[in-house]
């Protein structure tokens, strides 16, 4: 019975993915998300941990500013427009997303914003040979939720119009996360070949979220108001991640010209493409 259910579910998801790829917008989104995660993860095989931080900080500042701007100017307003009679409910979902991300980061150890902790980098024998399943699960939940708001339908207004802008934001955000995850797994497992299964699971989380939202539960999401709640939840998630990134890239609170330039570039790009 269980095997039959698994086979039916697998065939259904496979059919959904086929429809997904036949749609150019969806095909592009899944290709970009897979490429950025797997590409950034592969880079960890050649870039030393110490040198990785040199290019991660400007990229983090850029992606943090981009995500923050996109959330404030488009995702939050659209969530409020979808629930005009109950705007406070959106606020509650934003709070749930913000503080829910705080709890997820206890498990993920901040991998979402490019963290590879000092003790993990310099004590590779601690936890060696073991996959950090809780960390990976937290990352998958985080990534799945981000993918689930990428709905391309006229009924979702600005979110659909800015589909590509949000896809780019998620992809930019996933690059440092994938690099940090691959680095941590390499230190834990001792072989980069053993990194790929975990990296692939992370890479697939957002595409699966997109497929389910667009081809499995779209009508239920739109008719019940749950899509507005989902937007609020992910908006809170994005606000937590983006503000954490922006503050952490300059913990000494001094003027840092490269960080400032990257932040302004992220702000400008989000305003230009959205």
Name what the model sees in each region.
Residues 1-274:
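Intrinsically disordered, metal-sensing/regulatory segments
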């Amino acid at each position: 019975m269980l095997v039959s259910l698994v086979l039916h579910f697998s065939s259904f998801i496979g059919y959904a993915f086929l429809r997904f790829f036949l749609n150019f917008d969806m095909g592009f989104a899944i290709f970009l998300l897979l490429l950025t995660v797997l590409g950034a993860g592969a880079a960890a095989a050649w870039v030393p941990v110490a040198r990785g931080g040199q290019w991660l900080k400007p990229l983090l500042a850029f992606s943090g500013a981009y995500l923050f701007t996109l959330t404030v100017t488009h995702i939050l307003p659209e969530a409020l427009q979808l629930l005009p009679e109950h705007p406070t409910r959106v606020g509650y979902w934003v709070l749930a997303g913000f503080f829910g991300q705080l709890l997820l980061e206890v498990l993920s150890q901040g991998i979402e914003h490019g963290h590879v902790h000092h003790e993990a980098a310099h004590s590779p024998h601690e936890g060696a040979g073991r996959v950090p399943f809780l960390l990976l699960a937290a990352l998958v939940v985080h990534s799945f939720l981000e993918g689930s708001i990428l709905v391309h339908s006229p009924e979702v207004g600005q979110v659909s119009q800015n589909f590509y802008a949000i896809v780019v934001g998620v992809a930019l955000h996933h690059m440092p996360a994938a690099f940090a995850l691959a680095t941590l797994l390499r230190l834990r497992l001792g072989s980069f070949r053993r990194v790929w299964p975990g990296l692939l699971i992370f890479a697939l989380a957002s595409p699966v979220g997109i497929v389910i939202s667009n081809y499995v539960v779209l009508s239920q999401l739109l008719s019940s108001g749950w899509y507005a709640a989902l937007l609020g939840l992910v908006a809170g998630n994005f606000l937590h991640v983006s503000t954490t990134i922006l503050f952490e890239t300059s913990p000494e609170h001094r003027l840092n010209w490269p960080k400032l330039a990257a932040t302004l570039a992220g702000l400008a790009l989000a305003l230009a493409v959205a």
